[in-house]
Each structure stands twice: as C-alpha cells, then as structure tokens.
C-alpha cells in the first residue's frame, strides 16, 4: 500500500499592535463545494501547476544536495493561491507569478474558480482512493478578519476557520498539533514544537492520500536485503520488492533515462524516472509539463521484471527563503500588502513550513485482504521482457488522472534515511 501525508503551514505575524474586538469565527468542516462553470484557465492549470512543481523541485534540490526530496506541489499551489486571495498590489502579483500565472492573461476570478474546481475534483469521494485536501486558518482572537475573506476561503478552498488565543502559546500549539494529527490520521504528530510569540495567524494546508496498487507485489517475492547505490562510494541495504508484470514504460534516449508507470486501482498513478548513472542533473533540468506530455504519449505497455525498494521517507522544509528566491519577496517584507484579510496594517508572512511523509510497500490491498494476492495474468513462463531495477537514485511522481495534477514529487537518494 502506498501512503502519502502532507502538511503545509503559512505562519503570519503582525508587526503593529492591533486594536479590535474579538472575532468568533465559524468552526467545523465545510461540507459542500460547488463547481464553477468551466473557463479557459481550467485547461491551462495542469501545465502551469506542473511547471511550478518542477521549478520548486529544482530549488529544493540545489538547497538540499544529496538528500531525499519529497513534497506536494498541488497543495502548495492551492495554499499560495488562497493566500493571494487576501493580498493586493505587488504582493499578489509576485505570489501568482511564482505560481506561473500572469494576471494580464488570467483574470483573478478565473484563477480562483480554477483552484476551486481543482480542489473539489480532488476531494470527490472514491471507494478505492482516499484523497482529501483541505485548509484551516487559526486566527488570533484579537484580530477581526474581513467577513468577505472568511466567506470566500470557505467557498473556494473548503477552509476551516478557528479563533485561537495565541497569547497562551502552549494551548495554541496543542490546538494546532491536535488538528494536524487528526487530519493526517496520526501520521504527523507534534509538528510545532516551539511556537513563537507575536504570531497572529497560521494557515494549515494538508493532503491525505492512500491508494492500492492495481497489481500489488507479493510479500514472498521481496528480497529482504538488496544493494542500493547512494553514490559512487556508498551502498546501503534495502528490502527490494520484485514483480514480473505488464507496465507502461519508455526509454528516453534524448534524456538518458527510463520511465515506468505504475497504476493505482483508482484515478492515480506513480511515475518512476531512473536516469542513467551520471545523468540525474540532466534529467532534473529538463523536467517540465512538456516532458510529462511527451512521456505520456510515448509510454508503451509491455512485460517488465521490476525491482522497487520498500521504504519510508519524510521531508520537512521552511519554504520561506526558497519562495523569496523564486520571486515572492514582498509577502515576507515590511511592504507586504494583505488588504483582503484585514484592515490592520503590518501583516506579513513569517514562515512557510512544509512536511511530507511517504511509505511505499507491497500491500496494495484493502485491510483484511491477503498480502499474497497478485496479478492473475502473470505468466508461469517468463516472456521476453525488460528489466528495470530501481537500485540507485530515482525520481518519483504521483499524479491524479482526472485533473492531471502532480500530487507529489520527489527524489529518492537514500531509501534508508527516514
């Protein structure tokens, strides 16, 4: 079973003293989400969001050399788009330009409707695929946010809003951590350890994903200890899952890499990209929405003897400096402009925390099903087939089929490093 849990926090602080009456914001889940009429932006969003994902990936890879990389691009895009809804002037322009949108070509209303459509589509119930994305805003009791902002973020982003006493740091920290733990089904515990004073608003964005492999691995086929090359001088031992199955795959001669698609039983797929030794940076530089479209067109189904490591990794980032380097400067500066959130001056973005957890294993079946269940059409005599062994650094993407969204993106450098 393959499971992913993701958390993204935006922490905002006030530089000026706020004088206003306490605001009792509404609490509780948003249970309805109405899809807007489709517009031109909807058709551009998958490509724009994918290109943002790869730009952010390249920044994180440079900032975290030789480390595992893992994050949820679609969640970050949705959280920043939500933040842009309450921003103005150059603050808003920079946020949207970092995401890849040009306000000259894309009206703000169409953009917001596009994200509303995306979130509603991703949250659509499915018996075989657990996928839920949502937001929560924890607002200081002394701050009175604009009613329009509260209404809009509920309608567009399925956002829960909580009135929080940030003067009681330990209680506020416990409230947020409890919420995060509940929404990630216990996978992220105690996220915030040292909440600072003078924080007035925290935005939490989360995504929970759990899916079955369409063709689960047999536990009995897993090699308990197999070599995985971290670099030229380092080799680690990992459990290696093994299966002979028909997969869509493609050898990209131009980029010197092998691409393999593993389907989940519902509307999602995993894309593994294995560069030839010494060609990782070449592949990373070439990653784009056009590259994904090319691979999607050229993937061919055939028998593959596949070896995939069984592993768990997690990644935590403060994306503040990264987003500023990408061009989102004003939101973190004294000149930050958030007139759509509150009439009070001095509100700016202080932190942008991100945490993601990944587990990939053989199970791929519902609870209670036999772990030895396998493909019914696996041949007794192996036909002529390709062999793909993910035994060195590889790229990993999880995509949702209906919206063509990049749910998760990462690089596995060392599968033993959690």
UniProtKB/Swiss-Prot annotation:
GO cellular component: a single term: extracellular space
Entry's localization field: Secreted
Keyword Transmembrane helix: no
The UniProt record lists the keyword Secreted: yes
Leader sequence residues: 1-20
Expression sites by tissue: Expressed by the liver and secreted in plasma.
Intrachain disulfide bonds: none
InterPro entries, per database record: Serpin_CS, Serpin_dom, Serpin_fam, Serpin_sf, Serpin_sf_1, Serpin_sf_2
Residues annotated as binding thyroxine: 296, 401
Main location: secreted
Listed GO MF terms: hormone binding; serine-type endopeptidase inhibitor activity; thyroid hormone transmembrane transporter activity
Role description: Major thyroid hormone transport protein in serum.
Family: Belongs to the serpin family.
Protein name: Thyroxine-binding globulin
Organism of provenance: Rattus norvegicus (Rat)
């Amino acid at each position: 079973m393959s499971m992913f849990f993701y958390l993204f926090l935006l922490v905002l602080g006030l530089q000026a003293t706020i004088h206003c009456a306490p605001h009792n914001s509404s609490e509780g889940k948003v249970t309805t989400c109405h899809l807007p009429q489709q517009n031109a932006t909807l058709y551009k969003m998958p490509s724009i969001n994918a290109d943002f994902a790869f730009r952010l990936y390249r920044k994180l890879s440079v900032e975290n050399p030789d480390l595992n990389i893992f994050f949820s691009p679609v969640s970050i895009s949705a959280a920043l788009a939500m933040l842009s809804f309450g921003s103005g002037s150059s603050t808003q322009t920079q946020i949207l330009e970092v995401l890849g949108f040009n306000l000259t070509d894309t009206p703000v209303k169409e953009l917001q409707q596009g994200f509303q459509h995306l979130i509603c589509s991703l949250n659509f119930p499915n018996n075989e695929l657990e996928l839920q994305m949502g937001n929560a805003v924890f607002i200081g009791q002394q701050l009175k946010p604009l009613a329009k902002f509260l209404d809009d973020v509920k309608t567009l982003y399925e956002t829960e809003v909580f009135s929080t006493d940030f003067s009681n740091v330990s209680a506020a920290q416990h409230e947020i951590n409890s919420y995060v733990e509940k929404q990630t089904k216990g996978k992220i515990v105690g996220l915030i350890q040292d909440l600072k004073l003078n924080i007035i608003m925290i935005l939490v964005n989360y995504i929970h994903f759990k899916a079955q492999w369409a063709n689960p691995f047999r536990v009995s086929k897993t090699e308990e200890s197999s070599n995985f090359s971290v670099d030229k001088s380092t080799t680690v031992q990992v459990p290696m899952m093994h299966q002979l199955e028909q997969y869509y795959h493609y050898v990209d001669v131009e980029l010197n890499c092998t691409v393999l698609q593993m389907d989940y039983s519902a509307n999602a797929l995993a894309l593994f990209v294995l560069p030839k030794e010494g060609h990782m940076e070449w592949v990373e530089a070439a990653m784009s929405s056009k590259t994904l479209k090319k691979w999607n067109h050229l993937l061919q189904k055939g028998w593959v003897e596949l070896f995939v490591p069984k592993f768990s990794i997690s990644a935590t980032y403060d994306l503040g400096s990264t987003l500023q380097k990408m061009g989102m400067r004003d939101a973190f500066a004294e000149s930050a402009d958030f007139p759509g959130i509150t009439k009070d001056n001095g509100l700016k973005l202080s932190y942008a925390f991100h945490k993601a957890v990944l587990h990939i294993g053989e199970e791929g079946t519902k609870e209670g099903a036999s772990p030895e269940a396998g493909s019914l059409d696996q041949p007794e005599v192996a036909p002529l087939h390709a062999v793909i062994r993910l035994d060195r650094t590889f790229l990993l993407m999880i995509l949702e089929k209906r919206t063509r969204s990049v749910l998760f993106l990462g690089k596995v450098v060392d599968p033993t490093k959690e």
